[in-house]
Amino acid sequence: MEALRQRIEAAFEARAEITPATVEPSVRADVEKAIAMLDTGEARVAEKINGEWHVHQWLKKAVLLSFRIFDNGVIEGAETKYFDKVPMKFADYDEARFRKEAIRVVPPAAVRKGSFIGKNTVLMPSYVNLGAFVDEGTMVDTWATVGSCAQIGKNVHLSGGVGIGGVLEPLQAGPTIIEDNCFIGARSEIVEGVIVEEGSVISMGVYIGQSTRIFDRETGEVHYGRVPAGSVVVAGNLPSKCGTYSLYAAIIVKKVDAKTRGKVGINELLRIVD
């Protein structure tokens, strides 16, 4: 894999000269291999090592190179046709393969090739972009979007209309990450490389980016870019220093452990007790 990484890095430096007509066959083959590794889960854009998330930028570079290398083509759909550079992940699947991988895909869900979908996942009519990683047992509900290179953990529920932001550029930016056993409420948006740590519950209509204040009402601490593990978060506001206005914030109303979360329903967790 190290040799492949080095070749992808070198090709990326010369990307301005690369087009579908001029690309070297060896470069095309390397990019195709990297995309295939993302597609099968053999490689992923980000992974947790010793408790810290590490981003493999060369895989993002491979994804970006693919847009320069591959030309648009017709993609056949059940109800219509499409015209794009990236083929659909399930275009060549048959019943046996769907059953083997234990994936449910409800039409018209769209999943681009180069994204990984783990076993026992359910994809309602939703969208998963290339480079994304969706782990086992996760539900991607209706009209939810998993952006490019986003990392979704095991047993996550992305409710209807949820947006998980993608990140290809700027290149140095980290992907948006939802860790294992999280619940993201309907119409919430988690973007700009924010990390929602394990076992957290995000209520309906919560918007979190890198500049969003995440206020823990129990401790008074303010977080940016990270929702601590086991947090229950709702949309709210914090007053200005002068007291004349308030600005949006995400509010951590309580913390729960796995045992409590297993016994208590999501709706009950989201009840705010003053």
From Swiss-Prot:
Catalytic reactions of this protein: (S)-2,3,4,5-tetrahydrodipicolinate + succinyl-CoA + H2O = (S)-2-succinylamino-6-oxoheptanedioate + CoA
Binding site for substrate: R104, D141
Pfam families: Hexapep_2, THDPS_N_2
Keyword entries, A-Z: Acyltransferase, Amino-acid biosynthesis, Cytoplasm, Diaminopimelate biosynthesis, Lysine biosynthesis, Repeat, Transferase
PROSITE patterns: HEXAPEP_TRANSFERASES (PS00101)
Places the protein is found: Cytoplasm
Pathways per UniProt: Amino-acid biosynthesis; L-lysine biosynthesis via DAP pathway; LL-2,6-diaminopimelate from (S)-tetrahydrodipicolinate (succinylase route): step 1/3
InterPro entries given in the database record: DapD_Trfase_Hexpep_rpt_fam (IPR005664), Hexapep (IPR001451), Hexapep_transf_CS (IPR018357), THP_succinylTrfase_dom1 (IPR023180), THP_succinylTrfase_N_sf (IPR037133), Trimer_LpxA-like_sf (IPR011004)
GO molecular-function terms, A-Z: 2,3,4,5-tetrahydropyridine-2,6-dicarboxylate N-succinyltransferase activity; nucleotidyltransferase activity
EC number: 2.3.1.117
Any GO CC annotation of this UniProt entry: cytoplasm
Single Gene Ontology BP annotation: lysine biosynthetic process via diaminopimelate
Assembly behavior: Homotrimer.
Family: Belongs to the transferase hexapeptide repeat family.
Protein name: 2,3,4,5-tetrahydropyridine-2,6-dicarboxylate N-succinyltransferase
Organism: Shewanella pealeana (strain ATCC 700345 / ANG-SQ1)
